[in-house]
C-alpha cells in the first residue's frame, strides 16, 4: 500500500497532537537513542528531537514518499525506508516511538514483546493506535466496499488493518516483559470546518487508502461519492457547517 505525505499532512496539527500526548507520558529518564518507527513525514520525529536534544534520533517508514518528506523536514536526522515487521536491528534503543503505525501490522502478541527486546532496562516502548474500526467512518468504508461493483476487487481491503485489542489484552502481553505498563484510551473530537467532506479528506490520508488504491480513477470517484453520502448521514453538519469527528486512540507506554 502506498502513502502520500501531502495528503497525510493536510491535517498535521490534528495528527500530531496524539504524538505530543504520547511523548509527554514517556518517563523522564536519560535518553541516548530514540527511534521513530512508522515516522511518516517526520512530524512525530521532530517532537523526539525537541524532547531529547542530546540523543541520537532516527526514523524509519515503509513509504519512500514519507521518508523523502521527513528528510526535507529534518535533514540532520537519519531516516531509512524499512518495514517494521522486517526490521532486524537489535538496538538497544532507549525509546522506541510507534505513533499510529502498529494498527497496520498483524500479530501484536509477538510483535510487541519483540520490540521490547530492543530496549535496555528502563527503556520505553511508546505506542499510539487509532481504535476506529467500529466507528461509523470505518464501518462505512467496509459497507461501500461490499455493496459496489468493486466488491471482489476490494475483498481484502478491510483486512489490511489489525483490530486493536483490549487494554487488558495488551497489558497481559507486555507485563511479563516490562517493569511498568501504562495504558489509556482518549477520544479526540476534531472540529472540521469543511464539514462531512473534511472527514473524507482526512481518511483519504489514512484509513481509505487500502480501499482506494486498487480502484481505477472512475471507480475511485464513484466510491468516494458513495462514502461521502454515508458520512453526511452519520456525521450531520453543525449550524456553522462544520462537523465534530470523534476519534478514539489507544495509548501504551511500556517500560522494560
Give the role of each language-model region.
Residues 105-106, 119-121:
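Helix-to-beta-strand junctions that scaffold the AdoMet/dcAdoMet cofactor pocket
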